[in-house]
């Protein structure tokens, strides 16, 4: 996926990244279940609470569980067919990223966007030169946004450990929680760093996103893509 050059005109196919966002993938429900079982949040309510902090907490719950699964950054972008006039990008499907526990910037962004759409939090895919990260609305009206550098997900250890119920003793007669380490502080610190880095990149871009002719800076609206049949 990317740009194709026809004569001197670039054909922009970046909107196709939205096709990799799949909120109906069965793995999405499993991720949400693990997040609830881990106890980071009691429920996924989207914007119902009307509190941006509640939205951030829900996104963090997903971050924490993906860290527990061992997802790490992997900069694999090469495609099977390369052409001088086509700039392309390899994108993993959700199940590939989860099975291989690795994701590049695009893989991680579409994975998070898929889960957020499932819980009615509005995501966008943010494109800057040579890179992608995630944006998401903190309110239903889309007046306040946060940005997440998904490649930092491997920077803290919230890995699975032995045992159940958050690494401790399982509750008798109750459902088993996924064995997630109790080092919430390190996990939360990495999430806060990823939010700060996402915001830094948006601030650095300045007005570039407002220039529709600048294809290097785009925010791909997944809902708009869905309405167009993508």
Predicted regions and their residues:
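A structural boundary/capping signal
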Residues: 1-230
């Amino acid at each position: 996926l990317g740009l194709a050059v026809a004569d001197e005109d670039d054909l922009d196919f970046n909107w196709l990244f939205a096709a990799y966002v799949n909120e109906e993938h069965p793995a999405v429900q499993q991720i949400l279940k693990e997040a609830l079982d881990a106890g980071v949040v009691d429920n996924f309510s989207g914007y119902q609470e009307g509190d941006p902090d509640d939205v951030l907490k829900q996104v963090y719950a997903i971050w924490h569980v993906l860290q527990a699964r061992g997802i790490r950054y992997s900069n694999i972008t090469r495609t099977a067919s390369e052409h001088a006039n086509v700039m392309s990008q390899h994108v993993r499907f959700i199940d590939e990223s989860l099975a291989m526990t690795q994701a590049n910037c695009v893989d991680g962004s579409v994975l998070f966007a898929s889960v957020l759409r499932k819980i009615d939090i509005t995501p966008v895919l943010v494109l800057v030169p040579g890179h992608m990260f995630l944006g998401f609305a903190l309110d239903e009206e889309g007046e306040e946004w946060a940005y997440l550098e998904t490649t930092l997900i491997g920077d803290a250890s919230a890995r699975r450990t032995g045992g159940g119920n958050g690494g401790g003793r399982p509750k008798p007669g109750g459902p088993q929680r996924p064995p997630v380490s109790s080092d919430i502080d390190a996990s939360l610190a990495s999430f806060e760093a990823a939010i700060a880095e996402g915001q830094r990149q948006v601030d650095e871009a300045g007005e570039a996103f407002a220039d529709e002719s600048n294809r290097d800076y785009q925010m791909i609206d997944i809902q708009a893509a869905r309405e167009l049949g993508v």
